[in-house]
């Protein structure tokens, strides 16, 4: 009889623990979105914890940007974003510094519209010539686009001609404006380009020109379920999660 009572007590404790965090709200930015959209259902299946995902860039002036969402009082248990932007939130006292975990690195890639010829970008000079001969170029308003506009063009000494035919695209995936024919070339983090229909992935830009973006995650200081949030972060560092991240175009980092 006592074993039945003990089993009932343990079951009650486990159910109570799960009930304390049956739903987590996660804000994630573009580069990790494809991976997280695969991982969240797996985590729910394994733990019973429902995950609500809110999307937004790591920075920028759009209302959907994660810092802006948090600033106006939107709730999140976990934020997944560009590491430097996460550090800004940590320094501002918005995210618990002890909760930060490193997840993956992301590199910049290029797409063209499906059916279009793929220009050469296998060397710095080929890449430079491809840019100069392009009719139009689009890139994101997040970390990769900021780098392209402020650093890459200048490094290649083509800032003048490129700025005249380039556009920073807010809110939506860059691939979508290449797919509809609005722009000839599109640049964004690889993980954000691969899921877009109607484009062909040409490849990563030359490694000598890369800007590697680190993705990290943390728990806001006002999270409603901080303990459950940390368990999710542990899962995101697991081998299972790293394998999914790799498939979606990211380069996982070891915990």
Regions found by a protein language model. Name each.
Residues 1-2:
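N-terminal secretory signal peptides that target proteins for export/translocation
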Residues 22-64, 71-75, 84-92, 96-97, ...:
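Exported/periplasmic ABC-transporter solute-binding proteins
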């Amino acid at each position: 009889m006592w074993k039945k009572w003990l089993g009932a007590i343990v079951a009650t404790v486990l159910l109570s623990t799960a009930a304390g965090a049956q739903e987590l709200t996660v804000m994630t930015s573009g580069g990790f979105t494809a991976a997280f959209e695969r991982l969240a259902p797996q985590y729910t299946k394994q733990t019973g914890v429902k995950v609500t995902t809110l999307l937004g860039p790591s920075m920028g002036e759009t209302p959907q940007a994660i810092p802006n969402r948090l600033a106006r009082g939107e709730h999140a248990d976990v934020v997944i974003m560009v590491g430097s932007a996460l550090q800004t939130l940590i320094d501002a006292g918005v995210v618990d510094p002890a909760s930060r975990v490193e997840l993956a690195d992301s590199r910049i890639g290029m797409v063209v519209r499906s059916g279009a010829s793929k220009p050469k970008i296998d060397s710095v000079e080929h890449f430079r010539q491809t840019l100069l001969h392009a009719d139009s170029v689009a890139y994101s308003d997040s970390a990769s686009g900021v780098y392209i506009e402020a650093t890459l063009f200048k490094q290649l000494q083509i800032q003048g001609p490129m700025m005249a035919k380039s556009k920073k695209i807010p809110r939506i995936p860059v691939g979508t404006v290449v797919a509809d024919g609005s722009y000839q070339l599109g640049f964004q983090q690889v993980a954000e380009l691969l899921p877009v229909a109607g484009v062909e992935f040409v490849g990563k830009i030359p490694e000598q020109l890369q800007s590697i973006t680190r993705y990290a995650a943390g728990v806001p200081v006002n999270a409603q379920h901080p303990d459950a949030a940390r368990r999710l972060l542990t899962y995101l560092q697991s081998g299972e999660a790293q394998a999914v991240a790799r498939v979606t175009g990211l380069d996982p980092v070891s915990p």
